[in-house]
Amino acid sequence: MRRITPFFPFFVLLVSHFSLAISYPLPPEGSRLVGQPVTIAVPQNNTQPLESFAARYGQGLSNMLEANPGVDVFLPQSGSTLVVPQQLILPDTVREGIVVNVAEMRLYYYPAGTNTVEVLPIGIGQAGRETPRNWVTAVERKQDGPVWVPTANTRREYAKEGKTLPAMVPAGPDNPMGLYAIYIGRLYAIHGTNANFGIGLRVSQGCIRLRNDDIKYLFDHVPVGTRVQIIDRPVKFSVEPDGSRWLEVHEPLSRNRAEFESDKKVPLPVTPVLRTFIKGDDVDTSRVNEVLERRSGMPVNISAGRPGL
């Protein structure tokens, strides 16, 4: 049974009361499962939208929606419970620098010389202006008070909606890039926002958007030259040291406009390695099917004869 608690039972808030960076101790060798699931109670006479709970508990809106199907995004029901997906499987890649998994809309930062990983929710490029995927680059430079220069294509798109964009938006509180930017490669940035929504959504022009406390933390701690890897893995899985098998499935990103506008689920990418993993004799097949269909964004123990979440 999940414990109902209004507190953070296992992680540290890094910047302020509403800071979103969650610090997890790295698991022992051979393990990729970190954290614990938490359930919180929505206060009586609640007046806050789901975004407020997502921000308070270091999640993106998509993470909360996956974990709580059917929840009212504008006003979660007073007295109800919300699952906060604070348990996760670390991406199966090098634990170095920054790793962004666009499918789960999370950024992982492995600070050098520590035994921790900081996990932050992100917003990514909207359909047709995708954030790059399967890309390894580095932090080229950092800018306190970035200037936004919309591309000609961006200005045309805004014009179609009857909006006029200037050739340049100066630094300041009205800048869509927020107050800090970390430039990766030549064309993209990890930056803040001037809005109070959009984290966990596909809303940017292709860059990676963070809440303002989070980008301030990264800006202060991530050195120029840091390795940055962007992956697209809606399915993560792990065999833990005790032999248990865990599967975490997110809703994949749509691959085109038709998929984006369709009511049908986007097909999951099933690699040969994943197929072997879920077909093993020590796996509960019915539970696997449930996890693949449900796509809760949370790790589930799919081992035969073992309890799930």
UniProtKB/Swiss-Prot annotation:
InterPro entries (alphabetical): LD-transpeptidase, LD_TPept_cat_dom, Ldt_C, Transpep_catalytic_dom
Matching Gene3D superfamilies: L,D-transpeptidase catalytic domain-like
Family annotation (CDD domains): YkuD_like
Keywords: Cell shape, Cell wall biogenesis/degradation, Glycosyltransferase, Hydrolase, Peptidoglycan synthesis, Periplasm, Signal, Transferase
Signal sequence region: 1-21
GO cellular component assignments: periplasmic space
TM stretches of this protein: none
MF annotations from Gene Ontology: glycosyltransferase activity; peptidoglycan L,D-transpeptidase activity
Enzyme nomenclature, EC number: 2.-.-.-
Catalytic residues, chain numbering: H191, C207
Pfam families: Ldt_C (PF17969), YkuD (PF03734)
Pathway: Cell wall biogenesis; peptidoglycan biosynthesis
Boundaries of every L,D-TPase catalytic domain copy: 96-231
Subcellular location: Periplasm
Disulphide bridges: none
A GO biological process held by the record: regulation of cell shape
Source organism, top-level taxon: Bacteria
Family: Belongs to the YkuD family.
Database matches in NCBIfam families: PRK10190.1 (NF007563)
Protein name per its UniProtKB record: Probable L,D-transpeptidase ErfK/SrfK
Organism annotation: Salmonella typhimurium (strain LT2 / SGSC1412 / ATCC 700720)
Classification lineage: Bacteria, Pseudomonadati, Pseudomonadota, Gammaproteobacteria, Enterobacterales
